[in-house]
Amino acid sequence: MGRTRDNKAAVIADLKELLSDAQLAFVIDYQGLSVSEITELRNRLRPTGSICKVTKNTFMEMAVQEDDNWQPMTQFLTGSSAFVLVKDDVGGAVRAYQGFKKDTKKTEFRGGVMQGQALNEDQVKAIADLPSKEELMAQIAGALNSIATKLAVGINEVPSSVARGINEVPGSLGRVVNAIANKEEGNAA
């Protein structure tokens, strides 16, 4: 029994919603993968906030038709396609897929789309190598903390320097008085 028109419209609406939440989408050829292997890929992607959707190319084509950000995906819609839609952790999702691809050796990367740009596998790997949002936030926090620490040390150093200078004044005065006294004794003798 085929899909009804309403059912097809619901599938397309679901794809549009998934795409609206995604930062990156890439298309893979899933020819030769078993159901358990697709499930394994989905399980690997789940912790990264990504999903693997298997649907007809025509449904995906209809879903991206009106959205300029995803239009370039149409060039990858041939053969048996699975769509990895990455919501949060781009690097983690790409690494999860690469690990799966290495383990199964049955899937091929066709291409990806991010911010309206078609990407090849090397470009997607380069994006995956960038630090995650959490890593960048940690680096920024560390830099800000370093600045605050240096500022606090600098602010504390000013009164400490003044205090050392004030403590040095009586000793310096004493040495000056002794030097003058010694000079006068030397002149008197």
From Swiss-Prot:
Family the UniProt entry places it in: Belongs to the universal ribosomal protein uL10 family.
Cystine pairings recorded for this chain: none
GO CC aspect terms: large ribosomal subunit
GO molecular function: large ribosomal subunit rRNA binding; structural constituent of ribosome
InterPro entries with a match to the protein in the record: Ribosomal_uL10, Ribosomal_uL10-like_sf, Ribosomal_uL10_bac, Ribosomal_uL10_bac_type, Ribosomal_uL10_CS_bac
Signal peptide segment: none
Source species: Rippkaea orientalis (strain PCC 8801 / RF-1)
Lineage: Bacteria, Bacillati, Cyanobacteriota, Cyanophyceae, Oscillatoriophycideae
Listed Gene3D superfamilies: 3.30.70.1730, 6.10.250.290
GO biological process: translation
The protein, known as: Large ribosomal subunit protein uL10
Keywords, in A-Z order: Ribonucleoprotein, Ribosomal protein, RNA-binding, rRNA-binding
SUPFAM superfamilies: Ribosomal protein L10-like
